[in-house]
Amino acid sequence: MGLKLSGRYIFLVLAVHLAYLLQAVKATGKCDAVFKGLSDCMLTLGDKVANYPQDLEEKKNLDTICSYWDDFHVCTVTALADCQEGAADIWEKLKRQSKNLNIQGSLFELCPGSAGAPGQRLLFPAFLPLLMVFLSTLFILVLQ
């Protein structure tokens, strides 16, 4: 029994979450660049899922899907890093609510150690974009 994930199912769940996030960010009116960043994240995930190799063994299949999920979360955290209006907090709240839905076969369930869920699997790589943004900001402040 191999792992079968529908790309439409993944996008439906993510689209609902992103719509809620974008609505909350739009209400603040100050983080317009977030829209482009999050849509780029969604498109990149879509490209990866569309070009996903279907003939992998089950373990490799799951690792591949989870790496796409990790990349998506790193991308969203990076897109939200410049927005100081609480969008990152809303994103974290959405992730927690999504996990609580307990949808069988969700990426939170399938990838429990990924950047999208608590765990140790990719803790450092998920933190790396935030570190880079922090260091870039610090560097700019030092130069001024």
Curated annotation (Swiss-Prot):
This is Neuritin-A. The gene is nrn1-a. Belongs to the neuritin family. Residues 115-144 form a propeptide. One of its GO terms (biological process) is neuron projection extension. It is found in: Cell membrane. It is a lipid-anchor; GPI-anchor. Keywords: Cell membrane, Glycoprotein, GPI-anchor, Lipoprotein, Membrane, Signal. GO terms for cellular component: plasma membrane; side of membrane. InterPro entries: Neuritin_fam (IPR026144). Pfam families: NRN1. Modulates postsynaptic dendritic arbor elaboration and synaptic maturation. A lipid is attached at S114 (GPI-anchor amidated serine). The keyword NAD does not apply. Residues 1-27 form the signal peptide. The keyword Iron does not apply. Expressed in sensory regions of the brain including the visual, auditory and olfactory systems. Within the retina, only expressed in the retinal ganglion cells. Concentrated in axon tracts including retinal axons.
